[in-house]
Each structure stands twice: as C-alpha cells, then as structure tokens.
Amino acid sequence: MIFLVKRAGWWIADYAYAVYWQFRAAFDRQDAHAFASGDAAPLLILPGVYETWRFMQPLITALHDRGHPIHVLDALERNQRPVHDAAQVVEEFLEANRMTDVILVAHSKGGLAGKLAMAGSSGDRIRAMLAVATPFGGSRYARLLPVRSLWAFSPSGPSIVELAKLLEVNERIVSVYAAFDPHIPEGSELVGARKNVRIETGGHFRILADPRVLAEVAVLSEG
C-alpha cells in the first residue's frame, strides 16, 4: 500500500512538473543564441515528443552556466515527426554547421532520434549522448494510446526494432532513468551502454531536473 501511495505521489509530481514547464515553454521568448557561448564541450538538445527545446530550458540554463555552448533545433518544433525524420534533422544540422565532438542531451523520443543519428553518416561528429527517460525498448502502453503518432513507440514498432539492432553505438550512450517511469514500464536500461544510471525516484519528466543528469554530462564532457 505504501509503495502504491509513493508511486501515486511520483505520478502527480511528474505531471505537475510537465504541465508547469509546458506552460512556461509556450510563452517563453528566450533567444536560443543566448546559450551559444561557452568553452566546454558543445551540446545539442533533443527534446521529447510534443516538446520544444524550451521545455528543457531549466536543464539548458544549468548546463550553460557550467560553460557549455548549447545548440537547439528549431526545425524539430514539437518533435512530432517520425524518428527517422528527426534523426535527419540532427545530421543536417551537424553537417551544415560543421560541428564535431558534440554531446547530445536528449529526453525521451529525442534519445531515439539521437541514437539513429549516431549510427548515421554524421555519427563521427557525435562524441556521446546522454539520454534521459528514453524508451530504447519501447513501451507496451504505446498501442493503448488514442494518438497514432505514439504507436511508433510500441516494442514491435519498426523504429524500435531497428534501433535495437544498432548495438555498436550503445557504448557511447549514457542512459539515465527513474526507478518508476509511468510512461515506460519496461524502463530505459540499454544493453551495452557506456553507463546505465537508475535513479531511485519516479517520473518521466521531472527527472530532467535531477542533479545526476548534470553530473553525467560533466563526466561525458571530461572524457
């Protein structure tokens, strides 16, 4: 009973976080160029489905304060396009800006697009990826949802199946996830990952604010 109450509390806190920052993101007019300066490793932000980069602004601000130049992809908009298309946007951005040694910082679906980009023609431009709450193995809830665009996250979805075969890039990925994710009951552990970081909390969104995320980016930046 106590366990169920704890999960319910996590669920409520998670959606409160999501609603608050989605609302803030809808009205925020911060210029992305304000985060482009810095001498640390360059970071490229990949938000989740129905999220713009502004949803991740608390994390972006914290990373920029630590010296990282931050790059965002306005072309992704709310990241509703197929994973393959999102990965192509990532590759085109890296090529157009001649970026190298980039670390991807991704949330949820953004991690799927990031992994596909790492395996693509521009993969050598990417040093590593920190993926937060990414459904690498899919989610059995996907097919139960009334939105067709979310069915792609089913464990049997073509993109999920394809990504599972791309084992060679896993060693460059750090997967950070909560002990309880209401969206991904299977969890986000990635076989062969550079590191799997399981945080003893619950949530799919508010885990973006966990200090371990910043700590793991720092480790990737140093190595």
Predicted regions and their residues:
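Flexible, membrane-associating and regulatory peripheral segments of lipid-active enzymes
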Residues: 1-45, 50-73, 92, 96-99, ...
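Hydrophobic alpha-helical segments, principally membrane-spanning helices and signal/leader peptides
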Residues: 32-33, 166, 200
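Serine-dependent carboxylesterase/thioesterase catalytic core
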Residues: 43-54, 58, 62-172, 176, ...
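C-terminal catalytic-base region of ester-bond hydrolases, centering on the histidine
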Residues: 169-223
